[in-house]
Amino acid sequence: MKKILFLIVLGSVLSCKQKITDADISNLNGYWEIEKVELPDGDKKEYKVNETIDFFKIDGNKGFRKKVMPQLDGTYVTNDIQEDIVIAVKDGDATIQYKTTYASWKEEIIELTKDKLVVKNEQDLEYHYKRPVKFSVK
Protein backbone atom coordinates (compact mmCIF):
# COMPACT_ATOMS: atom_id res chain seq x y z
CA MET A 1 0.00 0.00 0.00
CA LYS A 2 2.83 2.39 0.86
CA LYS A 3 4.50 1.68 -2.48
CA ILE A 4 1.32 2.50 -4.39
CA LEU A 5 0.85 5.75 -2.47
CA PHE A 6 4.48 6.66 -3.10
CA LEU A 7 4.11 6.01 -6.83
CA ILE A 8 0.94 8.11 -7.00
CA VAL A 9 2.62 11.03 -5.22
CA LEU A 10 5.76 10.70 -7.33
CA GLY A 11 3.72 10.56 -10.54
CA SER A 12 1.75 13.67 -9.65
CA VAL A 13 4.91 15.60 -8.80
CA LEU A 14 6.65 14.63 -12.03
CA SER A 15 3.59 15.35 -14.16
CA CYS A 16 3.44 19.00 -13.03
CA LYS A 17 6.16 19.93 -15.50
CA GLN A 18 5.13 20.39 -19.12
CA LYS A 19 7.07 18.58 -21.84
CA ILE A 20 8.33 21.37 -24.12
CA THR A 21 8.66 20.78 -27.86
CA ASP A 22 10.32 22.83 -30.59
CA ALA A 23 6.82 23.86 -31.73
CA ASP A 24 6.08 25.32 -28.27
CA ILE A 25 9.07 27.68 -28.48
CA SER A 26 7.26 30.02 -30.90
CA ASN A 27 4.89 30.84 -28.00
CA LEU A 28 7.80 32.64 -26.34
CA ASN A 29 7.74 35.46 -28.92
CA GLY A 30 6.23 38.75 -27.81
CA TYR A 31 5.64 40.66 -24.60
CA TRP A 32 5.57 39.10 -21.11
CA GLU A 33 5.09 40.64 -17.67
CA ILE A 34 5.93 39.08 -14.32
CA GLU A 35 2.85 38.01 -12.40
CA LYS A 36 4.60 36.47 -9.39
CA VAL A 37 7.85 34.92 -8.18
CA GLU A 38 7.90 31.78 -6.04
CA LEU A 39 10.90 31.61 -3.72
CA PRO A 40 12.66 28.34 -2.78
CA ASP A 41 11.18 28.49 0.75
CA GLY A 42 7.63 28.59 -0.67
CA ASP A 43 7.03 32.31 -0.19
CA LYS A 44 5.53 34.23 -3.10
CA LYS A 45 6.01 37.78 -4.30
CA GLU A 46 3.05 39.14 -6.28
CA TYR A 47 3.49 41.86 -8.91
CA LYS A 48 0.44 44.09 -9.37
CA VAL A 49 2.11 46.73 -11.57
CA ASN A 50 5.24 46.32 -13.69
CA GLU A 51 7.31 49.31 -14.77
CA THR A 52 9.11 47.12 -17.30
CA ILE A 53 8.09 44.03 -19.22
CA ASP A 54 10.10 41.54 -21.24
CA PHE A 55 10.05 41.33 -25.03
CA PHE A 56 11.25 38.06 -26.60
CA LYS A 57 12.08 37.59 -30.27
CA ILE A 58 12.98 34.02 -31.25
CA ASP A 59 13.82 32.71 -34.72
CA GLY A 60 14.53 28.99 -34.70
CA ASN A 61 16.38 28.45 -31.45
CA LYS A 62 18.13 31.84 -31.23
CA GLY A 63 16.98 35.34 -30.44
CA PHE A 64 17.00 38.04 -27.80
CA ARG A 65 15.17 39.47 -24.79
CA LYS A 66 14.77 43.19 -24.13
CA LYS A 67 13.26 45.10 -21.24
CA VAL A 68 10.65 47.61 -22.42
CA MET A 69 8.60 50.21 -20.57
CA PRO A 70 4.87 50.45 -21.36
CA GLN A 71 3.54 53.96 -21.92
CA LEU A 72 0.07 55.36 -21.25
CA ASP A 73 -0.67 55.59 -24.98
CA GLY A 74 -0.15 51.83 -25.44
CA THR A 75 3.34 52.07 -26.94
CA TYR A 76 6.64 50.86 -25.46
CA VAL A 77 9.89 52.69 -24.81
CA THR A 78 13.04 50.62 -25.21
CA ASN A 79 16.79 51.03 -25.30
CA ASP A 80 19.56 49.28 -27.23
CA ILE A 81 20.37 46.81 -24.44
CA GLN A 82 19.42 43.24 -25.21
CA GLU A 83 20.26 39.79 -23.89
CA ASP A 84 21.12 37.26 -26.60
CA ILE A 85 19.46 33.90 -26.01
CA VAL A 86 19.67 30.34 -27.26
CA ILE A 87 16.87 27.86 -26.62
CA ALA A 88 17.94 24.26 -25.98
CA VAL A 89 15.24 21.55 -26.17
CA LYS A 90 16.09 17.96 -25.30
CA ASP A 91 13.78 15.09 -24.29
CA GLY A 92 10.94 17.45 -23.36
CA ASP A 93 13.15 19.71 -21.24
CA ALA A 94 13.91 23.23 -22.45
CA THR A 95 16.28 25.90 -21.21
CA ILE A 96 16.80 29.52 -22.14
CA GLN A 97 20.52 30.34 -22.18
CA TYR A 98 21.17 34.08 -21.80
CA LYS A 99 24.38 35.91 -22.68
CA THR A 100 25.43 39.53 -22.36
CA THR A 101 28.80 41.23 -22.43
CA TYR A 102 28.98 40.89 -18.65
CA ALA A 103 27.33 37.58 -17.75
CA SER A 104 25.70 34.36 -18.87
CA TRP A 105 23.01 32.32 -17.13
CA LYS A 106 20.18 29.93 -17.87
CA GLU A 107 16.57 29.33 -16.93
CA GLU A 108 14.57 26.12 -17.25
CA ILE A 109 11.19 26.45 -18.96
CA ILE A 110 8.62 24.77 -16.71
CA GLU A 111 5.50 25.76 -18.66
CA LEU A 112 4.97 27.60 -21.94
CA THR A 113 1.65 28.31 -23.62
CA LYS A 114 0.50 31.28 -25.70
CA ASP A 115 -0.65 33.04 -22.49
CA LYS A 116 1.57 31.64 -19.73
CA LEU A 117 5.31 31.29 -19.16
CA VAL A 118 6.94 29.76 -16.08
CA VAL A 119 10.74 29.58 -15.78
CA LYS A 120 13.06 28.53 -12.96
CA ASN A 121 16.54 29.99 -12.60
CA GLU A 122 19.70 28.53 -11.08
CA GLN A 123 18.80 29.98 -7.66
CA ASP A 124 15.49 28.02 -7.70
CA LEU A 125 13.41 31.18 -8.15
CA GLU A 126 10.32 30.39 -10.21
CA TYR A 127 9.07 33.28 -12.35
CA HIS A 128 5.45 33.25 -13.53
CA TYR A 129 4.72 35.48 -16.53
CA LYS A 130 1.50 36.44 -18.29
CA ARG A 131 0.76 38.43 -21.40
CA PRO A 132 0.39 42.13 -20.58
CA VAL A 133 -2.86 43.95 -21.14
CA LYS A 134 -2.28 47.17 -23.05
CA PHE A 135 -3.66 50.23 -21.38
CA SER A 136 -4.25 53.67 -22.73
CA VAL A 137 -5.68 56.95 -21.56
CA LYS A 138 -8.18 58.43 -23.99
Question: Predicted segments — roles?
Answer:
Residues 34, 63-67, 94-98, 117-121:
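Short hydrophobic/aromatic-rich beta-strand segments that constitute the beta-sheet cores
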Residues 76-110:
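An anionic, turn-rich surface loop/hairpin at beta-sheet edges
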Residues 45-89:
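N-terminal glycine/threonine-rich, aromatic-flanked beta-hairpin/loop signature
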Residues 106-109, 115-128:
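Short, exposed beta-strand-loop hairpins at the edges of beta-sheets
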Residues 12-15:
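C-terminal motif of bacterial Sec signal peptides marking the signal peptidase cleavage site
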Residues 18-33:
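N-terminal helix-cap/turn-to-beta initiation motif at the start of protein domains
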Residues 127-138:
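Short, low-complexity, Pro/Ser/Thr/Gly-rich segments in the mature regions of secreted, periplasmic
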Residues 1-4, 18:
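Positively charged n-region of N-terminal signal peptides that target proteins for export
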